[in-house]
Amino acid sequence: MAQPEDPEDFVAPAAYRVRAGTMLLANTDLLEPTFRRSVIYVVEHNDGGTLGVVLNRPSETAVYNVLPQWAKLATKPKTMFIGGPVKRDAALCLATLRVGIDPAGVDGLRHVQGRVVMVDLDADPDSIAPMVEGVRIFAGYSGWTIGQLEGEIERDDWIVLSALPSDVLVEPRVDLWARILRRQPMPLSLLATHPIDLSRN
């Protein structure tokens, strides 16, 4: 299989700078098990650092067993997702708003980007339900101190890309990492064909 000629060909376009609502895709050389082929949605990026959640790491723990009041709104497979290695005992919730819903001033919702919001898990699910297409709940998160993520991006550990609202709720059976790459322009889209098992290469 043909391989990229030069890793520098796959540096994120200048327009894609890290901010809330962007995604970090693990580059093919990032083989550390926690983040290999991971897709991280950036929730916060400011002077205090960066916080995001891994979108494609489902666990086997049912939402109902942890937060039963939110199980009805959770999208399939209705399990907790592993948001990252930090504070695994803490839960963070993202949702995609229905088209036309404005989250401004709504108790329990905090706008992230576009139709994506953070949901306060202490809120009443019944009050949130009419406004969202579904929720996804993460155990833990991924975090970087000031300058740490920038260093990893310069090292080409991460590809910075824009996100679609639908990316947040994609079912685990979909290879989200490859799907996002396939919709990018050449030559970046070539990375989508990179094998999951390196032994196949």
Swiss-Prot record:
Q: Which Pfam families match?
A: DUF179
Give TM segment ranges.
none
Report which superkingdom the organism of origin falls in.
Bacteria
What InterPro entries is this protein classified in? AlgH-like
Identify the GO cellular component terms for this protein: cytosol
Q: Coiled coil located at which positions?
A: none
Family the UniProt entry places it in: Belongs to the UPF0301 (AlgH) family.
Protein's recorded name = UPF0301 protein Mvan_6057
According to its UniProt entry, this protein's organism is Mycolicibacterium vanbaalenii (strain DSM 7251 / JCM 13017 / BCRC 16820 / KCTC 9966 / NRRL B-24157 / PYR-1)
